[in-house]
């Protein structure tokens, strides 16, 4: 009895028909290969007792010095943190969410990018007055802002006025108001502007979508939401995240004319720095003060004569300029915070002074803060860490930012053309390299070089991705448990990332999935499993167990071959037995055969057949062309290696 060994290479090849994928796996769902054996992808279990009430678009995880894990979840409308106590809403005050951040107007950009009728030019502020928790801004020229629009206030001398707010009323053409709970105060200077961090799609294959970016500064986290633009800071235990340079005050204690300020979080101030205190219960403490000492990360002192006393509450803010209207943030190994699209300049990369994310004084000769305005073809989109530095993308290019030391600190060189991202989050960093989905193919950065990445399922991706939702919601991540980069994208007609592909960068094969919608994901490492979210706001451990949060997956895990080359298709064959190299879990799988007598003829399905414990599977299949489907029957672990077919030649007819 002849035995035909089915030497099928790992991975899915997804051309138009099974015949075109001869001798390969043609279709699959949630399976992977390891050392030549076919395995099921793990299940997922919920770690949130209730869904978050906003769609998650980015996840980031880190640990403290005690190796306690934490994670933050950047949503369209909110920001959450997961600690040992569960999920907590830490959305910063005045946060501008995604659904109100995608504004536009005429005269400030290219035709068709922005909404007609709004002027995005900066308006100089003459006065800013806060009375009874209502701020009135007076501009030097008519502003043209409507009620309900978000407005970005920056550079006011009293920095407590700065931030993003919603316009409550427009008394005159040069005044508008917004609500802000703080002590009565007045100031001047600065500018008002409508945020334009996000824009309408410039074409069907690209839209500069909303995104969150995170990176840890030691035990703390820095963050930027592209719709909001502020550089945010969060320290575990704080009630909410807040703008860098601004801290909530626990109390101020004056003893012997020395005032000690205790803040709720790490303030980041330095000796001789000027800060503005507002809203403290003891009014004499409010005003602009000079830091005289910094006893700890959460305390500083200033001198003020008077009787010993204590005041509580309020806020303290640096008077130093902190960039606003930013696109993304990353922290380099040299301990510089880096902002992409900084200060509303879509081509600017700016970095803080070393070891101080609150020092952005670019004119200083005593720090290492600086910026570079790149000569790019298009605007900056996103950044990611790689072994040689920081990879930066524009809509169409890739740039590499490298540390070079004094006096220039960083250099930024263009290393790729026509290799832009499908969406701002459509990338995965893997072992110092980076893999990303472009607009028409996949790319890899490796060792300073950008090159196309061969993709056996590229047609499946780019023929099925939704041209409108794909540039908005496609995202990627490293798996972390397995050497794989995963990418989720919305299918035609869908607004949720409901299809996925994944690439094993060690064995160089591709897999596909169609039954697991995920809006964001993050690799294992800090946590034992990858983290992911679905469109309902549920948070999961991936690769945990074998079920879908307790629900069965079973036959949804499968791999289906293309045409099998038995006798080169020149004669009929009768297949009567299959010998399977099942490492374990043989009783958790089944085989279904598809046979036909001509390449274009109709197929006949035979089975499913259940493998026996001795490795044999009895079948009865006749045809000239054959295919086989391997599917799970249980939510359990299994493996299948090489298969051999026992067949009887039946002649040419």
Predicted regions and their residues:
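Hydrophobic or amphipathic alpha-helical targeting/insertion segments
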Residues: 217-234, 239-243
């Amino acid at each position: 009895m002849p035995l035909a060994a089915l030497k099928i290479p790992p991975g899915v090849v997804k051309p138009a028909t099974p015949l075109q994928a001869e001798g390969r796996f043609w279709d699959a769902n949630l399976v992977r290969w390891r050392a030549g054996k076919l395995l099921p992808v793990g299940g997922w279990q919920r770690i949130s007792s209730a869904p978050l009430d906003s769609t998650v678009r980015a996840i980031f995880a880190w640990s403290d010095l005690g190796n306690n894990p934490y994670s933050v979840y950047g949503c369209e409308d909110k920001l959450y943190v997961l600690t040992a106590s569960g999920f907590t809403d830490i959305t910063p005050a005045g946060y501008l969410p995604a659904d109100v951040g995608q504004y536009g107007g005429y005269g400030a950009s290219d035709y068709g990018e922005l909404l007609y009728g709004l002027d995005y030019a900066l308006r100089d502020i003459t006065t800013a007055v806060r009375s009874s928790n209502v701020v009135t801004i007076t501009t030097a020229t008519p502003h043209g802002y409507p009620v309900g629009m978000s407005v970005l206030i920056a550079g006011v001398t009293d920095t407590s006025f700065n931030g993003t707010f919603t316009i409550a009323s427009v008394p005159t053409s040069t005044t508008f108001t917004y609500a802000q709970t703080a002590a009565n105060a007045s100031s001047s200077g600065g500018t008002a502007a409508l945020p334009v961090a996000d824009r309408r799609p410039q074409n069907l294959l690209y839209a500069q979508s909303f995104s969150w970016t995170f990176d840890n500064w030691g035990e703390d986290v820095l963050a930027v939401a592209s719709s909001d633009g502020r550089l945010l800071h969060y320290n575990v235990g704080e009630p909410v995240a807040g703008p860098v340079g601004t801290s909530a005050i626990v109390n101020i204690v004056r003893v012997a004319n020395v005032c000690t300020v205790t803040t709720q979080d790490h303030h980041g101030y330095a000796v001789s720095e000027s800060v503005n205190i507002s809203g403290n219960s003891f009014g004499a403490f409010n005003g602009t003060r000079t830091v005289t000492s910094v006893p700890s990360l959460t305390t500083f002192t200033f001198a003020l004569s008077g009787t010993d006393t204590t005041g509580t509450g309020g806020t303290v803010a640096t008077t130093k300029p902190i960039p606003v209207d930013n696109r993304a943030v990353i922290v380099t190994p040299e301990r510089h915070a880096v902002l992409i699209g900084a200060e509303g300049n879509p081509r600017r990369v700016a970095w803080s002074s070393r070891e101080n994310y609150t020092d952005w004084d670019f004119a200083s000769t005593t720090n290492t803060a600086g910026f570079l305005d790149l000569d790019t073809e298009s605007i900056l989109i996103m950044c990611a860490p790689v072994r040689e530095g920081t990879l930066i993308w524009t809509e169409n290019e890739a740039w590499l930012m490298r540390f070079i030391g004094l006096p220039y600190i960083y250099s930024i060189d263009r290393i790729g053309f026509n290799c832009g991202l499908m969406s701002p989050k459509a990338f995965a960093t893997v072992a110092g390299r980076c893999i990303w989905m472009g607009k028409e193919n996949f790319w890899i950065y490796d060792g300073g070089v950008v090159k196309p990445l061969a993709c056996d399922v590229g047609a499946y991706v780019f023929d099925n991705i939704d041209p409108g939702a794909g540039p908005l919601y496609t995202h990627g991540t490293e798996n972390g448990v397995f050497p794989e980069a995963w990418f989720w994208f919305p299918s035609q007609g869908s607004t949720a990332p409901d299809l996925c592909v994944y690439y094993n960068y060690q064995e160089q094969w591709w897999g596909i999935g169609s039954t697991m919608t995920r809006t964001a994901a993050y690799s294992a490492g800090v946590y034992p499993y990858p983290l992911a979210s679905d469109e309902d706001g549920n948070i999961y451990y991936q690769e945990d167990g074998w079920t879908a949060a307790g629900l069965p997956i079973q036959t949804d895990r499968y791999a289906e071959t293309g045409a099998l080359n038995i006798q080169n298709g020149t004669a009929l064959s009768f297949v009567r037995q299959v010998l399977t190299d099942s490492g374990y879990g043989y009783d958790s799988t089944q085989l279904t055969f598809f046979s036909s007598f001509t390449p274009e003829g109709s197929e006949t399905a035979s089975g499913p057949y259940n493998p026996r414990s001795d490795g044999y599977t009895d079948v009865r299949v006749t045809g000239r062309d054959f295919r086989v489907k391997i599917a799970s029957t249980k939510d359990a672990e299994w493996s299948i290696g090489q298969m051999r077919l026992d067949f009887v030649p039946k002649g040419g007819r």
